[in-house]
UniProtKB/Swiss-Prot annotation:
Gene Ontology cellular component terms for the protein in this record: cytosol
Protein's GO biological process: D-ribose metabolic process; pentose-phosphate shunt, non-oxidative branch
UniProt: substrate binding residues: T26, G27, S28, T29, D79, G80, A81, D82, K92, G93, G94, G95, K119
Keywords annotated in UniProt: Isomerase
E.C. number: 5.3.1.6
EC class: isomerase
Subunit structure: Homodimer.
Annotated organism of origin: Stenotrophomonas maltophilia (strain R551-3)
SUPFAM superfamilies tied to this protein: D-ribose-5-phosphate isomerase (RpiA), lid domain, NagB/RpiA/CoA transferase-like
The protein's name: Ribose-5-phosphate isomerase A
Active-site residues, record numbering mapped to chain: E101
Residue stretches spanning the membrane: none
Length: 215
């Protein structure tokens, strides 16, 4: 699948325009995008990064990393996904960067999601849904989510997000109404961010292949 990821990332470069500050996500597919972006870095002003991992890779290539507080709204955000449905709703957060990813997506006029074909699903939920939580609320939220959804929350032990929080992964879900579940989970006290990107879903999905498919 690495070649499919690379092809999706290369296709996304076509959406980068001169003078842009580009929002950059996190993950293995985005790593290919950062590498491709490095080849045209003379055309862009810099990048807003969603994680320390992506920041390090951008800086390795000499791409200027700009804080979102200083960049203002962005024209373009490119990120991957753990799952993607036919309506361009996503599950994200396998790399634990979901909160910053969602913030940058919200700040961006256009959100391009780059995936390999294995990430396309008819119904979201086979991939465990990540939820970033305040540490003291972890057990409470796990019980509430179990009661609310029937899913099985597990604590991603040993993982601390860039924001200093913890991750619950919710297994055994069939998410037929992603926007509703995103809204309901967001209302639980102690939830920082839900890894459902439904209210702010992708505008374009690029599925890597020969040739890449643009949805």
């Amino acid at each position: 699948m690495s070649e499919a990821k690379r092809l999706a990332a290369e296709k996304a470069i076509e959406y980068v325009e001169d003078g842009m500050i580009v929002g950059v996500g996190t993950g293995s597919t985005v790593a290919y995008f950062i590498d491709a972006l490095a080849r045209i870095q003379h055309r862009i002003k810099g990048a807003v990064s969603s994680s320390e991992q992506s920041t390090a890779r951008l800086k390795q290539h000499g791409i200027e990393v700009i804080e979102l507080n200083h960049s203002g709204n962005l024209s373009l955000y490119v990120d991957g996904a753990d799952e993607c449905d036919a309506n361009k709703c996503l599950i994200k957060g396998g790399g634990a960067a979901l909160t910053r990813e969602k913030i940058i997506a919200e700040a961006s006029e256009r959100f391009i999601c780059i995936v390999d074909p294995s990430k396309q699903v008819p119904v979201l939920g086979k991939f465990p849904l990540p939820v970033e939580v305040i540490p003291m609320a972890r057990s409470l939220i796990a019980r509430q989510i179990r009661d609310m959804t029937g899913g099985q929350p597990t604590w991603r032990e040993g993982v601390v997000t860039d924001n200093g929080n913890q991750i619950l992964d919710i297994h055994n879900l069939q998410i037929t109404d992603p926007e509703k579940l995103e809204r309901e989970l967001n209302q639980l006290p102690g939830v920082v961010c839900v890894g459902l990107f439904a209210r702010r879903r992708a505008d374009v999905v690029i599925v890597g292949g020969e040739p890449p498919v643009v949805l």
